[in-house]
Amino acid sequence: MAATSNSGEDPTLSYHHRSPFRFELLQSISSSDPRYSSLTPSSTNRPFSVSQSLPNSQLSPLISPHWDDSYSQITQKVQKSRKNHRIQLGSIANMSGGESIDIAKVIVKQESSPQNVKRVYNKSKGGTKLLKAGKRMANGEVQNGGLNGASINCRYDSSLGLLTKKFVKLIQEAEDGTLDLNYCAVVLEVQKRRIYDITNVLEGIGLIEKTTKNHIRWKGADNLGQKDLGDQISRLKSEVESMQSEESRLDDLIRERQEALRSLEEDDYCRRYMFMTEEDITSLPRFQNQTLLAIKAPTASYIEVPDPDEMSFPQQYRMVIRSRMGPIDVYLLSKYKGDSAETSDKLGNESDQKAPVGVDTPSLKIVTSDTDLKADYWFESDAEVSLTDLWSNFNS
């Protein structure tokens, strides 16, 4: 049965804390060996500790009188080889009688602890260089407020970028935009040369200017620009939202009016009154004291009015109306005094007066003869003659 020693104390060491090494006795002690017959059964079943002292009657031949010297040599080798994971020890010769005894194989295991620090060894010309790969702090030291428990600032906390942001924020908080560099160094808890590094850059790009040796003033956009820019962005966003809501309201109104017009077109009762009278047209300001023609033509009809300047003197005005889909109705509307009577006398049987039902108007409907339905209508006028006096039909 293998005996193990898990003692936390090393008697050869002067310090008093838990040893990082653990010793295991791998070779079994046979009870049949006469050399070990003097040991009591209780001593073989309990953990073997090197620090235990045996009676003088049991030292020979089990252990040599020079056991203390031999054991000190073993412990010295163990201390020198502390970084090794395994140490195998052979037999130790008896210094006096020439006898040798088997001590057993001792395995030295270094127990891990939170205080251990990982290191990487790199070989160089100058020798072995110790490279630091990581650092761990014990939880107890952090809780007890040791040296390792102090807060360590990261690189970003001491960067010029962060200091510049804090510096600009101090300028924003200043009433007139003027800042004392000494006060700034005290507030930011940095050396004054770091403040000078920031001011040199900001002065170089034209954002600040020095009023005195230790005072600077912001010379960028009013109210530091950034604040105004944020206000302007917020204002523009609100305007866009307002315009979008107004556009949505107008779209709803247009949709409602389109639906109302569609319902009027589909209503038979409303379609009976969907027309304009002569008074509705001539009452418009731009159509007063003008000669007006009302044309009712089918779909795909077109009107051509040649340029009167292309004609020979005197100027003549022509209007060509053509349609291949059906007849064309032309109504002459005029408010000149005596135009209606003169036109009726000259046209005679070639024209008849026709007005919408229930409307008393002197409008004149121009019609063609029954034998010349395919002819175009040509309307010509002189400066002294009315337009209706010169109308005639020509063969196409």
Swiss-Prot record:
GO process terms (BP): cell division; cell morphogenesis; DNA endoreduplication; glucosinolate metabolic process; negative regulation of cell division; positive regulation of programmed cell death; regulation of transcription by RNA polymerase II
| Keyword Cell cycle recorded | yes
One matching Pfam family is E2F_CC-MB
- DNA-binding region at which residues? 155-220
In terms of InterPro entries, this protein maps to: E2F, E2F-DP_heterodim, E2F_CC-MB, E2F_WHTH_DNA-bd_dom, WH-like_DNA-bd_sf, WH_DNA-bd_sf
- Renumbered to this chain, region (Disordered) spans 34-57
Citing just one GO molecular function, the answer is:
transcription cis-regulatory region binding
Q: What happens to this protein after translation, modification-wise?
A: Phosphorylated by cyclin-dependent kinase. Phosphorylation is necessary to target E2FC for proteolysis.
Regions annotated as coiled coil: 226-268
**Gene Ontology CC terms:** cytoplasm; DRM complex; nucleolus; nucleus
Q: What is its main location?
A: cytoplasm
Q: Where in the cell is it found?
A: Cytoplasm
Bilayer-spanning residue ranges: none
Please give the tissue specificity annotation from the record for this chain. Answer: Expressed in meristematic areas, vascular tissues, apical part of the roots, cotyledons, upper region of the hypocotyls, trichomes, young flower buds and pollen grains.
SUPFAM superfamilies linked to this entry: E2F-DP heterodimerization region, Winged helix' DNA-binding domain
Annotated spans, Retinoblastoma protein binding: 376-391
**Keywords from the named record:** Cell cycle, Coiled coil, Cytoplasm, DNA-binding, Repressor, Transcription, Transcription regulation
Stretch list, region Leucine-zipper = 236-264
**Spans of biased composition, class Polar residues?**
34-48
The similarity annotation says: Belongs to the E2F/DP family.
Q: What does this protein do?
A: Involved in transcriptional repression. May act by repressing E2F-regulated genes in mature differentiated cells, but is not an antagonist of E2FA. Restricts cell division and is involved in the coordination between cell proliferation and endoreduplication during development. May play a role during the transition from skotomorphogenesis to photomorphogenesis. Regulated by phosphorylation-dependent proteolysis via the protein-ubiquitin ligase SCF(SKP2A) complex.
* Subunit details: Heterodimer with DP proteins. Interacts preferentially with DPB, but also with DPA. No interaction with DPB when phosphorylated. Interacts with SKP2A, CDKA-1 and maize retinoblastoma-related protein RBR1. Component of a DREAM-like complex which modulates a variety of developmentally regulated genes and of the mitotic genes in proliferating and differentiated cells. Interacts with MYB3R3 at later stages of leaves development.
* PANTHER family (UniProt xref): TRANSCRIPTION FACTOR E2F (PTHR12081), TRANSCRIPTION FACTOR E2FC (PTHR12081:SF51)
Which protein, by its recorded name, is this?
Transcription factor E2FC
Q: Which organism is it from?
A: Arabidopsis thaliana (Mouse-ear cress)
What gene makes this protein? E2FC
